[in-house]
Amino acid sequence: MDRIVEIEKFSPDETYETSLRPSNFDGYIGQENIKKNLEIFIKAAKKRNECLDHILFSGPAGLGKTTLANIISYEMNANIKTTAAPMIEKSGDLAAILTNLSEGDILFIDEIHRLSPAIEEVLYPAMEDFRLDIIIGSGPAAQTIKIDLPKFTLIGATTRAGMLSNPLRDRFGMQFRLEFYKNEELAIILEKAALKLNKTCEKNAALEIAKRSRSTPRIALRLLKRVRDFADVNDEEIISEKRAKEALDSLGVNELGFDAMDLRYLELLTEAKRKPIGLSSIAAALSEDENTIEDVIEPYLLANGYIERTAKGRIASLKSFDVLKLKYNKGLFDEK
């Protein structure tokens, strides 16, 4: 079943929520330190008439990595070409992309941690020396043909920075980790987005949606669209706190941003009474794949202290027992 709070993964040519995304830094809310540094680096690069150094964005899904890449393209007056690592299956696929770049272009690769080692090998000289090394033939007769590439900026995005190989990670001159948003920041984003949807969103309504959005802009914007539907059906031009609560309750998203899947996950861990449960066991119990659990369900729960991740598996924290209103033996949480 589809989850309204799920961070969906999209192919690069899909334009999910494009109309609601900011196109420049002036309209970009949150991630202030990253934004400040990027503005300086962009001004410096433009002053020297150079390409930006390669950039790596990491962090949970839905926080604005793709949006930042497009803003950088806009601010640099550069063309951006977008792809995702799973689409680059052979070294020839990457070679075709690189040889079609023009001077100053930006290449954005989403899910860059999923590049195969063979593809990474092709990328190294391209990033470092703007050169493509193509091997023709095999064995003693093999020859390497070197093709010069135009200078470009590679922007990589990943939800799993730890899965990047060290040689690839080290070739990014700028590395930024995006953090979860504060409710107040999300409320501002929602109020601005509502205007683009020809609605006015009351501040309290925006805060109500924000606190149920798992600190994630993409989820907040998705919830806003559904709340707008409830307002439209009731012929309301203003989204009120009452209407927002009604819509979100109807969607099954509680005050903490949890839906039925999150609650099932927490129930599974609390039933184990602080005994670690492995990822594969959790996936089997929830009928979900392991990647979805690690990339979609767990980041918010981990960041907010609802669960603990150990070498032996996942453990419910005290907050999980409180959320589910469960009685527990305080001895479960004694330091061992």
Swiss-Prot record:
GO molecular function: ATP binding; ATP hydrolysis activity; four-way junction DNA binding; four-way junction helicase activity
Compartments, as annotated in UniProt: Cytoplasm
GO cellular component: cytoplasm; Holliday junction resolvase complex
Gene Ontology biological-process entries: DNA recombination; DNA repair
UniProt keywords, alphabetically: ATP-binding, Cytoplasm, DNA damage, DNA recombination, DNA repair, DNA-binding, Hydrolase, Nucleotide-binding
Amino-acid positions noted as binding DNA in the UniProt annotation, renumbered to this chain: 309, 314
Protein EC: 3.6.4.-
Reaction catalysed by this enzyme: ATP + H2O = ADP + phosphate + H(+)
Keyword Cytoplasm: yes
Annotated region described as Head domain (RuvB-H), given as residue ranges: 255-336
Region annotation (Large ATPase domain (RuvB-L)) ranges: 1-181
UniProt-listed InterPro entries: AAA+_ATPase (IPR003593), AAA_lid_4 (IPR041445), DNA_helicase_Holl-junc_RuvB (IPR004605), P-loop_NTPase (IPR027417), RuvB-like_N (IPR008824), RuvB_C (IPR008823), WH-like_DNA-bd_sf (IPR036388), WH_DNA-bd_sf (IPR036390)
Pfam families: AAA_lid_4 (PF17864), RuvB_C (PF05491), RuvB_N (PF05496)
Binding site for ATP: 20-21, 62, 65-67, 128-130, 171, 181, 218
Region span, Small ATPAse domain (RuvB-S): 182-252
Broad EC category: hydrolase
Subunit: Homohexamer. Forms an RuvA(8)-RuvB(12)-Holliday junction (HJ) complex. HJ DNA is sandwiched between 2 RuvA tetramers; dsDNA enters through RuvA and exits via RuvB. An RuvB hexamer assembles on each DNA strand where it exits the tetramer. Each RuvB hexamer is contacted by two RuvA subunits (via domain III) on 2 adjacent RuvB subunits; this complex drives branch migration. In the full resolvosome a probable DNA-RuvA(4)-RuvB(12)-RuvC(2) complex forms which resolves the HJ.
Family affiliation: Belongs to the RuvB family.
General function of this protein: The RuvA-RuvB-RuvC complex processes Holliday junction (HJ) DNA during genetic recombination and DNA repair, while the RuvA-RuvB complex plays an important role in the rescue of blocked DNA replication forks via replication fork reversal (RFR). RuvA specifically binds to HJ cruciform DNA, conferring on it an open structure. The RuvB hexamer acts as an ATP-dependent pump, pulling dsDNA into and through the RuvAB complex. RuvB forms 2 homohexamers on either side of HJ DNA bound by 1 or 2 RuvA tetramers; 4 subunits per hexamer contact DNA at a time.
UniProt cross-references to NCBIfam families, sorted A to Z: PRK00080.1, ruvB
Name recorded for this polypeptide: Holliday junction branch migration complex subunit RuvB
Originating organism: Campylobacter lari (strain RM2100 / D67 / ATCC BAA-1060)
Gene name, Swiss-Prot/TrEMBL: ruvB
